[in-house]
């Protein structure tokens, strides 16, 4: 595995590759990341993994500062996976002329997390666009854990006629049901138990929600009783259009954002 921080050096190694896969990350690797990387390796001739904590996508400075990262630990976790290139750029490598404030993304940005995190998805689309322009991968691998983000990037790539294929990968969960996430390291043991109970509550009531045997407000009240003080939203939506499903099918998900102390 070659570890590269300069984009020009990376380009020298990869510019001839025709079947290049790319996994963008912000580090703090867990089994979810490793699953993305393994899938990329299995489908592509060469694999590039990046670690870059994208400052512009954070709405609060303190969230950026406390984001967990340990490069040495991350390298150890993937060194035996047959990754070809690990790209570790700094802020100037990615934003030599500053951020693009005029980037246009789909109306999906106004829903769910976009309503509460202004500019977040524009910043995500901007950095993904910059990475694609540098690496020019045939495929880019993103997790379905961040479903709204995945749909926005899919739409952005299609709208801008970018040749890279976006591959959505299944969510990997811990034994307690929680999706593997770098943010989980910020939770206490008791908070993880609450998060696990919420996941199980949603799974148990998913069919009842779509059939309207139980309301979202009833679920919201149950979650509040578990000790959650703030819920930004809870919705059941078609996963492709992010609208309320108009017919009974399996093409929907429950979307929720809530806080456990200061962790969202």
What kind of feature is each model-predicted range?
Residues 256-260:
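Short beta-strand elements
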Residues 1-230, 237, 241-252, 262-264:
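Nucleotidyltransferase catalytic core that binds NTPs
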């Amino acid at each position: 595995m070659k570890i590269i921080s300069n984009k020009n050096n990376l380009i020298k190694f990869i510019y001839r590759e025709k079947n290049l896969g790319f996994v963008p990350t912000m580090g703090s690797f867990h089994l979810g990341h490793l699953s993305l990387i393994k899938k990329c390796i299995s489908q592509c001739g060469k694999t590039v993994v990046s670690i870059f904590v994208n400052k512009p996508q954070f709405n609060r400075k303190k969230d950026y500062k406390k984001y967990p990262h340990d490069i040495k630990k991350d390298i150890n976790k993937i060194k035996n996976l047959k990754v070809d290139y690990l790209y570790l750029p700094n802020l100037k490598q990615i934003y030599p002329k500053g951020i693009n404030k005029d980037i246009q993304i789909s109306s999906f940005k106004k829903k769910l997390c976009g309503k509460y995190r202004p500019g977040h998805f524009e910043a995500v689309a901007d950095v993904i666009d910059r990475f694609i322009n540098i690496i020019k991968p045939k495929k880019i691998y993103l997790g379905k854990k961040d479903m709204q983000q995945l749909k926005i990037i899919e739409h952005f790539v299609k709208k801008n006629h970018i040749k890279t294929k976006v591959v959505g990968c299944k969510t990997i969960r811990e034994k307690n049901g929680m999706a593997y996430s770098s943010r989980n390291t910020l939770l206490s043991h008791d908070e993880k138990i609450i998060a696990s109970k919420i996941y199980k509550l949603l799974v148990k009531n998913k069919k009842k929600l779509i059939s309207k045997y139980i309301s979202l407000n009833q679920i919201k009240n149950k979650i509040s009783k578990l000790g959650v003080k703030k819920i930004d939203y809870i919705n059941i939506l078609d996963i492709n259009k992010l609208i309320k499903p108009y017919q009974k099918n399996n093409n929907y998900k429950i979307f929720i954002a809530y806080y456990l102390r200061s962790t969202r």
